[in-house]
Amino acid sequence: VGGSEFSRKVRREYSRIQPQTDQQLREMTANYYGMISLIDHNVGRILQALQTYGLDEDTLVIFSTDHGDFMGDHGLYLKGPMHYEGLLRVGLLMKGPGVPLDKVVNSPVSTLDLCPTFLDYAGGESEPDLHGTSLRHLLEDPTADRDFALNEWDLLPGRAGVKLDLRVVRTQTHKLTLELESGEGEMYDLKNDPHELHNLFHEPAQRAVRNELTDMIRSRPDDMRPVGTPVGAA
């Protein structure tokens, strides 16, 4: 729905995986690992260049990504509007002035926190409408903690067959995905069900947990400026 005929053609022919043989799936997986090795090699080149030019002790380096890949989890490949750990839980490594060595942060954080973190370490002032929070206090204060991190994804029918307004909250023990229009969702106890196989969303005994997580989702200001056509225009 929507978009040009060309964009619809691209969506139909190139954005969905056609049925694959086991051998083809193995090759896809091998290609993914190959791309990881390529990234690792070239990040190493960047770090070596910083060292060569004497900038490594005065540069904040953050290595992360926008999302993961299902890689067969839940019978899925690539990415999609299913917020399982393989897609959302990505690496985040930091090195630079003031960043403690061997520090591990177990609190849930978000890529929304990166911009405030850059500003904090650079001595700049954070904008008042930024939703993220600097990660510096989590790195430098051993008593600091974060209760939850948020994620959202809005899709038009052309991407998933139906319009979806998805909101996600991740704590250290639970995850809730809520679809705003229908009120449906998925909720997992990550401590006891790390592979997210047992949806607790409609379990009466879990209602209090679901309500608490829903309140966390609704605590985020709904003030995002329109950034263009949502994902799935084709």
Predicted regions, residues:
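C-terminal helix-rich "cap/oligomerization" subdomain common to oxidoreductases
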Residues: L213, I217-G228
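Non-transmembrane alpha-helical segments in soluble domains
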Residues: Y33-I36, D40-L47, Q51, C115-L119, ...
